[in-house]
């Protein structure tokens, strides 16, 4: 606590009431005492490092102006400017000079230097890089790139020669069919001379002669197989002996309705329904009456094939009776 002044000191410092001039001089010579808040605000710059974000802003505004001789280390700015926002910069790592990706790109750059000029400029700019990332290319890298280019060129030539040698004659386009044309008779003087060197067309024609023979053989074989298949389906897959015993004329497809005529069938099956007309044969009217008109073609053919199969079995086993088709 602050001690109060005594009465004697007050009497000495207080001027007399009659001398007003002395009182005015005393007031001018001795300034008024500052309060604790004002003294703290005046000495604030000595103890506070920064005034940003302080809670005593209004106190600094009401501060008493100081003497011109007083200097502060950290003067208070009149206008508080916002601090710039610091952004984190992400630095990209430069590619390693011995990276496999760079090696492949360098090889492509060496190969295609004459093909694409714009790409060449871009690749040069990429490999040169900035001033900080410039790195001298070692002679070993250059030597490896040259060796790789030489090996790749040799491999390309080797593959091309192998493909040309291994290309079969069948890959050539088929020759146009040769049409025999009768050439007019020319006199002996106008007859063209036979060239010494044979042209490529003649060579191809001579090479394709064997192929033409094979095509003729295939066509003959195909026609034979087709005839055999037609015979098989015409006689319902029966053996030639069965067909001969039943009669080939009974398998003719003259009309849509299959009406086989059984005239030459002679079997020891007297109890069957066909034995009644074994002398005169099966009449067409009776067969048409047996086969209804509403029966489909597939069902009718299936019944006939089943009946023929039964006939074959009856021939193999004479004891079995021959039944009429359903």
From Swiss-Prot:
One of its GO terms (biological process) is regulation of cell projection assembly. Pfam families: FAM110_C. It comes from the Eukaryota. It is found in: Cytoplasm, Cytoskeleton; Cytoplasm, Cytoskeleton, Microtubule organizing center, Centrosome; Cytoplasm, Cytoskeleton, Spindle pole; Nucleus. InterPro entries: FAM110, FAM110_C. Residues 209-221 have a biased composition (Polar residues). GO terms for cellular component: cell cortex; centrosome; microtubule; nucleus; spindle pole. PANTHER family: AGAP005440-PA (PTHR14758), PROTEIN FAM110C (PTHR14758:SF5). This is Protein FAM110C. It comes from Rattus norvegicus. The gene is Fam110c.
């Amino acid at each position: 606590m602050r001690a109060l002044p005594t009465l004697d000191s007050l009497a000495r410092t207080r001027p007399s009431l009659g001398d007003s001039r002395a009182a005015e001089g005393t007031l001018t010579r001795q300034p008024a005492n500052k309060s604790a808040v004002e003294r703290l605000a005046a000495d604030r710059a000595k103890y506070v490092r920064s005034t940003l974000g302080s809670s005593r802003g209004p106190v600094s505004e009401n501060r008493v102006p100081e003497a011109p001789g007083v200097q502060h280390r950290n003067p208070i700015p009149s206008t508080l400017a916002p601090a710039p926002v610091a952004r984190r910069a992400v630095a990209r790592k430069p590619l390693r000079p011995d990276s496999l990706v760079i090696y492949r790109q360098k090889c492509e750059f060496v190969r295609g230097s004459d093909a694409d000029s714009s790409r060449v400029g871009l690749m040069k700019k990429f490999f040169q890089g900035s001033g900080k990332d410039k790195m001298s290319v070692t002679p070993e890298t250059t030597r490896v790139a040259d060796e790789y280019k030489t090996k790749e060129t040799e491999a390309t030539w080797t593959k091309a020669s192998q493909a040309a040698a291994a290309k079969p004659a069948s890959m050539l386009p088929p020759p146009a069919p040769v049409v025999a044309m009768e050439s007019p008779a020319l006199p002996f003087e106008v007859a063209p001379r036979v060239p010494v060197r044979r042209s490529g067309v003649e060579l191809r024609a001579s090479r394709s002669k064997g192929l033409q023979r094979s095509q003729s053989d295939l066509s003959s074989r195909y026609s034979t197989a087709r005839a055999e298949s037609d015979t098989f389906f015409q006689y319902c897959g029966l053996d030639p002996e069965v067909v001969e015993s039943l009669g080939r004329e009974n398998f003719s497809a003259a009309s849509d309705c299959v009406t086989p005529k059984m005239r030459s069938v002679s079997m020891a099956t007297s109890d069957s329904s066909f034995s009644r007309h074994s002398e005169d044969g099966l009449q067409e009217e009776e067969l048409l009456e047996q086969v209804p008109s509403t029966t489909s073609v597939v069902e009718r053919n299936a019944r006939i094939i089943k009946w023929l199969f039964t006939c074959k079995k009856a021939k193999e086993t004479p004891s079995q009776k021959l039944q009429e088709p359903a």
